[in-house]
Curated annotation (Swiss-Prot):
It is a multi-pass membrane protein. The lineage of its organism: Eukaryota, Metazoa, Chordata, Craniata, Vertebrata. PANTHER family: CYTOCHROME B. The keyword Magnesium does not apply. One of its GO terms (cellular component) is mitochondrial inner membrane. InterPro entries: Cyt_b/b6_C, Cyt_b/b6_C_sf, Cyt_b/b6_N, Cytb/b6-like_sf, Cytochrome_b, Cytochrome_b_C_euk/bac, Cytochrome_b_N_euk/bac, Di-haem_cyt_TM. It comes from Myotis bechsteinii (Bechstein's bat). This is Cytochrome b. Keywords: Electron transport, Heme, Iron, Membrane, Metal-binding, Mitochondrion, Mitochondrion inner membrane, Respiratory chain, Transmembrane, Transmembrane helix, Transport, Ubiquinone.
Length: 379
């Protein structure tokens, strides 16, 4: 008799995706982040669902409803902080996942990569709208500043902004629709994750050496289920330490002040995971130019496969490219720091130099270095 997991229509899909999936025998811990992202998404949807049961998306009561969740709802405080800090863990895992893809040439699976980039955009949009919901000062002004960027679009910009706002400023209509979209998008993300996995399982996973691994595959379970549990324990430990000891460490104190359209905070800035893009936006003194640079800073990932000029897929055996890669990582950390600083000397010039370096490394230096390395192979 055939095992039910191999014959039942639904069990068969699960079996082929998570149990008997042939996996390269040499993938490292950098391949853990896919499963961690799945767990983060599950955590966010679960905590978010329970928070939505007590939250009210009305400008008069939104701030108080969040306070009510933290003070009066049983374990509401832990739900709220798991959700807020869970978003930070989500982005840490996301950036490490993308970084792994860049380092080991996983972007050569173009369908999987492109859906991943769309997923990144969708998760960023979801996080931005979620940040508006507590209706604190930074929520309100963050929403005002970021949505107002669309007014830079020629001809239709102003109409577009007012259409998104649902009025002439960020108000009740804006908050209500942001809540609706913030609730809906995670389910769309879940569907997109399934498509992401569908395309990945068409080709199989890449590996650290960047060479075909068809000759040496092992089943996903028990080898990588056990390996992923280690990563999960590390992530859960970090998240719980953050939630239980310093839940507001990554937040902004201004968001504990109710939204006031008549008082602008001294420094308007987004959550830490958007600071690198915000720094690129601010480094260009022109509004439309800044918006284009902001979008390009993430959309540039789409063209990465076209910029691959190396004869080797992975960076494992390409020391010059490795140096550039870690320079890019340092540059992104610099941009993240600059994004949180006030707009004054010397931060402005550092931000501009870091932005130029970011685009130069990806568009110019990486492809040229790969060509040099191709010649070095002939020595």
């Amino acid at each position: 008799m055939t095992n039910i997991r191999k014959s039942h229509p639904l069990m068969k899909i699960i079996n082929n995706s998570f149990i008997d999936l042939p996996t390269p025998s040499n993938i490292s811990s950098w391949w853990n982040f896919g499963s961690l992202l799945g767990i983060c998404l599950t955590l966010q949807i679960t905590t978010g669902l329970f928070l939505a049961m007590h939250y009210t998306s009305d400008t008069a009561t939104a701030f108080n409803s969040v306070t009510h969740i933290c003070r009066d709802v049983n374990y509401g405080w832990i739900l709220r902080y798991l959700h807020a800090n869970g978003a930070s863990m989500f982005f840490i895992c996301l950036y490490l996942h993308v970084g792994r893809g860049l380092y080991y040439g996983s972007y050569m699976y173009t369908e999987t990569w492109n859906i991943g980039v769309i997923l990144l955009f969708t998760v960023m949009a979801t996080a931005f709208m979620g940040y508006v919901l507590p209706w604190g000062q930074m929520s309100f002004w963050g929403a005002t500043v970021i949505t107002n960027l669309l007014s830079a679009i020629p001809y239709i910009g102003t109409d577009l902004v007012e259409w998104i706002w649902g009025g002439f400023s960020v108000d009740k209509a804006t908050l209500t629709r942001f809540f609706a979209f913030h609730f809906l998008l995670p389910f769309i993300i879940t569907a997109m994750v399934m498509v992401h996995l569908l395309f990945l399982h068409e080709t199989g996973s890449n590996n650290p050496m960047g060479i075909p691994s068809n000759a040496d595959m092992i089943p996903f379970h028990p080898y990588y289920t056990i390996k992923d549990i280690l990563g999960l324990l590390a992530m859960i430990t970090t998240l719980l330490t953050l939630v239980l000891f310093s839940p507001d460490m990554l937040g902004d104190p201004d968001n504990y002040t109710p939204a006031n359209p008549l008082s602008t905070p001294p420094h308007i800035k987004p959550e830490w995971y958007f600071l690198f893009a915000y720094a690129i936006l601010r480094s260009i003194p022109n509004k439309l130019g800044g918006v284009l640079a902001l979008i390009l800073s993430i959309l540039i990932l789409i063209i990465i496969p076209l910029l691959h000029t190396s004869k080797q897929r992975s960076m494992a055996f390409r020391p010059l490219s490795q140096c550039l890669y870690w320079l890019l990582v340092a540059d992104l950390l610099t941009l993240t720091w600059i994004g949180g600083q006030p707009v004054e000397y010397p931060f402005v010039i550092i931000g501009q130099l870091a932005s130029i370096l970011y685009l130069s490394i990806i568009i110019l230096l990486m492809p040229l270095t790969s060509l040099v390395e191709n010649h070095l192979l002939k020595w």
